[in-house]
Amino acid sequence: MAKGVNQKLKLLYLMDILLEKTDENHGITMNEIISSLESYDVSAERKSIYRDIEELQRYGLDVLSYNNGRATYYHVASRLFEIAELKLLVD
């Protein structure tokens, strides 16, 4: 598979995708992750994304997975701030 222009940024883009497109109630599939990375001109295979998710977990990002039928969904379970805390900061 040809490498994209932004390959060195793959881990950061993956973190952004997980933070922006998921929460404890909404996950994202591996195919959706791959498509999202392609929009950043980053090519990736499932195995490399599994390793990247493990690295993000080691870094402290609370990435969890769950199965729904045949699909596995990934999501960020906890955030730096909860919605109520953000509202308090804004007020």
Predicted regions: what is each one?
Residues 1-91:
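Short, basic/aromatic recognition patches that contact phosphate-bearing ligands
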